[in-house]
């Protein structure tokens, strides 16, 4: 439930912070929320639960890989893309992440795709294409770049989700989350420095959004996602893709007056329909085993 409700609102918070009037460079905003979030988690791990902070080298290796994919490429990519596209639009593109997970798992496991799987992918990917129809027609270069970054972020998140599920089972979700955000945050800080992002000059609203992202986005929701991946089947965890875009589109329209067009609604419907079809296909295969 935390993943459903909180993550849908983080797209709005990111947009408020990184838009021109917000004052936060996108990579600095993403990096700082990850670093502060990891610090809070490490304090909780040490002071309340009394756990050691050291990890085995193999475990740390997979945390480094997933941290860079999830937080640096995933969260950082969304933050950067939201300087070019609206919060609701970004959430809709990221809502197609379960399609990426399904494609990657089908390739890795060498499964022969069913007719339902193929049709669902075509519908879902068609929805993403329809969402970008106006930008392509109008040759909106900024939005097209934003979409490309979001697709890469989605692919990174999907890849990390699969690695997390297959290589990090049985370990502490809170410890995993802390290290992933620390490593991803450091990666973003290095990238921000290399790209020469300016010193932040955030507005009050941007600071409030940043605080929300640290506490609710990084400490609570991100950690809940890591925990859910260990406790639940992947296709159940990924059902957040049904809810997050709806919440994000509504909040973007309500707070920032982001435009919701017939293209938006039609494309969003196809994406969600495609995701539902993929989940039904995966659920049916699981039940037959």
Feature annotation, model-predicted:
Residues 6, 10-11, 42-94, 130, ...:
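Specific transmembrane alpha-helical segments of multi-pass solute transporters/efflux pumps
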Residues 41, 45, 96, 113-134, ...:
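Hydrophobic transmembrane alpha-helices of multi-pass small-molecule transport proteins
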Residues 58-65, 113-124, 171-180:
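Cytoplasmic-side transmembrane-helix entry/capping segments in multi-pass membrane proteins
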Residues 17, 29, 33, 81, ...:
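Hydrophobic/aromatic residues within transmembrane alpha-helices
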Residues 22-27, 31, 55-61, 133-156, ...:
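Juxtamembrane helix-entry segments on the extracytoplasmic side of multipass membrane proteins
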Residues 32, 71, 75, 89-96, ...:
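Helix-helix packing/entry segments at the starts of transmembrane helices
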């Amino acid at each position: 439930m935390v993943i459903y409700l909180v993550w849908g609102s983080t797209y709005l918070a990111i947009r408020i912070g990184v838009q021109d009037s917000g004052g936060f460079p996108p990579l600095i905003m993403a990096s700082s929320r990850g670093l502060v979030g990891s610090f809070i988690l490490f304090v909780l791990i040490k002071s309340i639960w009394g756990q050691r902070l050291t990890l085995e080298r193999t475990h740390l290796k997979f945390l480094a890989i997933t941290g860079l994919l999830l937080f640096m490429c995933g969260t950082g990519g969304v933050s950067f893309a939201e300087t070019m596209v609206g919060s609701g639009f970004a959430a809709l593109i990221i809502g197609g992440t379960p399609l990426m997970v399904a494609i990657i798992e089908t390739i890795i496991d060498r499964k022969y795709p069913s007719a339902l799987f193929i049709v669902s992918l075509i519908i879902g990917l068609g929805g993403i294409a329809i969402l970008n129809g106006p930008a392509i027609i109008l040759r909106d270069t900024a939005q097209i770049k934003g979409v490309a970054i979001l697709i890469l972020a989605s692919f990174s998140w999907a890849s990390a989700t699969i690695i997390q599920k297959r290589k990090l089972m049985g370990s502490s979700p809170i410890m995993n989350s802390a290290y992933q955000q620390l490593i991803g945050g450091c990666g973003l800080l290095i990238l921000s420095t290399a790209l020469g992002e300016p010193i932040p000059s955030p507005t009050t609203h941007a600071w409030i959004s940043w605080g929300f992202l640290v506490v609710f986005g990084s400490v609570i929701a991100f950690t809940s996602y890591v925990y859910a991946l260990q406790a639940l089947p992947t296709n159940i965890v990924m059902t957040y893709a049904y809810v997050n875009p709806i919440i994000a589109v509504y909040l973007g329209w309500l707070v920032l007056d982001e435009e919701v067009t017939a293209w938006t609604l039609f494309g969003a419907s196809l994406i969600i329909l495609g995701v539902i079809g993929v989940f039904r296909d995966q659920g049916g295969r699981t039940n037959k085993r």
